[in-house]
Amino acid sequence: MEKDLHLHEKKCLAHEAATQVTSGMILGLGSGSTAKEFIFALAHRIQTESLAVHAIASSQNSYALAKQLAIPLLNPEKFSSLDLTVDGADEVDPQLRMIKGGGGAIFREKILLRAAKRSIILVDESKLVPVLGKFRVPLEISRFGRSAIIEEIRHLGYEGEWRLQDTGDLFITDSSNYIYDIFSPNSYPNPEKDLLKLIQIHGVIEVGFVIEKVEVWSSNSQGLISKKYSV
């Protein structure tokens, strides 16, 4: 029942976000279950309104779904800016700082967020938290020298574990890297400091803290949408 409720919230958010798309836009498609609903809503508008847009997908899963739904896709090596990126998040604090990357696509997701003139993050209200840290923070790690990289991370006081596939093998991202999920018993009241320390480690390719200028749209169980804007 709770799963169905969250799905309803995601669909409401996705359809509202799709109304922000106009012909001629180049869009960034996020990853995860909420971004998936946005891709469906976008495809519906393209099919019913002859909307002319192009998109860049942040993951192979989003790419495959967009292609299946006949959303025109661009070469990810060729774009320089985006009009709008729509994605989800794992946690959002009152300052709209986020933890993202639960699906393992944080490196590509951040590229799309930073390239976009406007970014909309869609979450159900359960993702709004007073302080970040209940959700583990994914680090995208180089496969080369991974054990040495983890030693540096632990030296800074962070504990974690390698993300695994269902087979028990190490999870490999679409960019052919590993994911190391860190956790903190004290949460992250100052994620900017944690982000700066971690990203300076050579071999840490990306960190799942997101501190960008974004709009966060949240929905409650009644389908009411609240919009907040970072400054």
Swiss-Prot record:
Record: residues binding substrate: 31-34, 87-90, 100-103, 127
Enzyme Commission designation: 5.3.1.6
Assembly, per entry: Homodimer.
Keyword Isomerase: yes
Keywords noted in UniProt: Isomerase
Pathway: Carbohydrate degradation; pentose phosphate pathway; D-ribose 5-phosphate from D-ribulose 5-phosphate (non-oxidative stage): step 1/1
Listed GO MF terms: ribose-5-phosphate isomerase activity
Pfam hit, one: Rib_5-P_isom_A
Keyword 4Fe-4S: no
Protein name per the record: Ribose-5-phosphate isomerase A
